[in-house]
Amino acid sequence: MIIVLSPAKSLDYDTPAHVQSYTKPAFVDDASELIDGLRKLSPQDIATLMDISDPLARLNFQRYADWSTTFTPANAKQAVLAFNGDVYEGFDAKSLSSADLDYAQQHVRVLSGLYGLLRPLDLLQPYRLEMGTRFPTARGKDLYAFWGDRITRALNEQLETRSGAARVLVNCASTEYFKSVKPKLLAAPVITPVFEDWKGGRYKIISFHAKRARGLMARFIVENRITDPKALKDFATEGYAFDAAASNDSTYVYRRRVGE
């Protein structure tokens, strides 16, 4: 079983890492190619391209200037500890044991506009480059064209080491990021967990809660060493419960109704 997550825009390089082990990203050469292109942009160009504030554009202008093909704990941090958004609050990697993180290293992958595909312990230098950014390169008009089928092939290398029910990809990423994966080329079926909360008289996806729940699901898989997708139906964290009637073989729906 492989779980894919989206990255986070918010990063934490202040909290010391509680594990010393780390690995190097697989697609450093590709990331370096993107950085070379990003370095040609002015802060104003970056602000316009990414629709961000001038201070944030200047910050990322400097990040691109500082970025190096040499990754060390001095200039980088393990990805799953550096990302700090809603998904990663749910995953809460800083409270996972070393054994849990070792398991996550084999089963969790993070999709990234700059790095392509990251393992949890891959060192991450700070950046901002969302997968949906229309940043043209020699490979095409945007990052989906840039990455092509590279991410899918890398996932297949991992999926092909699994067998039986364990050969499955659990999509806990956003639509924007999962578009970088080509499901028809995957060597495994895809299961997408969907999290809905009751609001305004009906169940609906509420972004903040759904993002956190994706992280909770990834943690549930890691802590329980789940390999059979049927066991995903037992997920019942923070009030969510599997809804068989709303689900099918490729979409597992979890619903929560609180505060009434």
Curated annotation (Swiss-Prot):
One of its GO terms (biological process) is response to hydroperoxide. Signal peptide: none annotated. One of its GO terms (cellular component) is cytosol. InterPro entries: YaaA (IPR005583). It holds the Pfam family H2O2_YaaD. Belongs to the UPF0246 family. NCBIfam families: PRK02101.1-1 (NF002541), PRK02101.1-3 (NF002542). This is UPF0246 protein Bcep18194_A5551.
